Amino acid sequence: MLRSLLQSGHRRVVASSCATMVRCSSSSTSALAYKQMHRHATRPPLPTLDTPSWNANSAVSSIIYETPAPSRQPRKQHVLNCLVQNEPGVLSRVSGTLAARGFNIDSLVVCNTEVKDLSRMTIVLQGQDGVVEQARRQIEDLVPVYAVLDYTNSEIIKRELVMARISLLGTEYFEDLLLHHHTSTNAGAADSQELVAEIREKQFHPANLPASEVLRLKHEHLNDITNLTNNFGGRVVDISETSCIVELSAKPTRISAFLKLVEPFGVLECARSGMMALPRTPLKTSTEEAADEDEKISEIVDISQLPPG
């Protein structure tokens, strides 16, 4: 009887010690105990693999085979509209992200909005669709950026602003100014000085015309520039003795055409802003409205769930 009690007590002690070991093995120091127990244990040798011995022909063939084919997708203009926080350093972070990917920004306009602490950033760049989409997502992951909208395939209204100072004395006087600037910035340019003297000796040069004839030419040039500017929707904002300043707000292609047309008069100075863009508001036709109504009815009432008959 006493022996059986001792045996049962021994089993209970062993069971409790095993349970204690199990509980200890799952504690936070189990990893430390494992490292202490296996500190002096010899580690098994690492497996060795014999690398194949290649020659130059095999290596070149493998490199050519593994090199991906260049993308044949054409590069096109992309318009990105970024909604960002109005705080210092946002512009540098966005432009740095694009520069890291090798993009050349064609146009960049940043301005405040009607909402406090919110700015709008319009970026125009050239690139492939996939690469630009990756850059757009990377910019959108920046902390001060709310969202980046891609207006590339959307119907948008584009506008740029240009101010140009145009000569009223004609192309000859403009060429005289260019040559004079060339001689003043390059020492010892004897050929340019000879060209200046040759142009000034011509009969049609403003310096050789009577004052009344020069006045008539200036008014004719001003009238032509004013009519051309009005046809493009711009206006003359300043007139001086030898030049005038015109202002025009239009889409980029129209501004480029205007500058090309006033180039013969002599563009002395030009300041052109970047492109601003806003999406057009879609207008639905009667057919699209009927299709939307049918779709709403089909979503509300599922014909397959109706009872037969």
UniProtKB/Swiss-Prot annotation:
One of its GO terms (biological process) is branched-chain amino acid biosynthetic process. InterPro entries: Acetalactate_synth_ssu, Acetolactate_synth/TF_NikR_C, Acetolactate_synth_ssu_C, ACT-like_dom_sf, ACT_dom, AHAS_ACT, AHAS_small-like_ACT, ALS_regulatory_subunit. SUPFAM superfamilies: ACT-like. Keywords: Amino-acid biosynthesis, Branched-chain amino acid biosynthesis, Mitochondrion, Transit peptide. Pathway: Amino-acid biosynthesis; L-isoleucine biosynthesis; L-isoleucine from 2-oxobutanoate: step 1/4; Amino-acid biosynthesis; L-valine biosynthesis; L-valine from pyruvate: step 1/4. Belongs to the acetolactate synthase small subunit family. NCBIfam families: acolac_sm. This is Acetolactate synthase small subunit, mitochondrial. It comes from Saccharomyces cerevisiae (strain ATCC 204508 / S288c) (Baker's yeast).
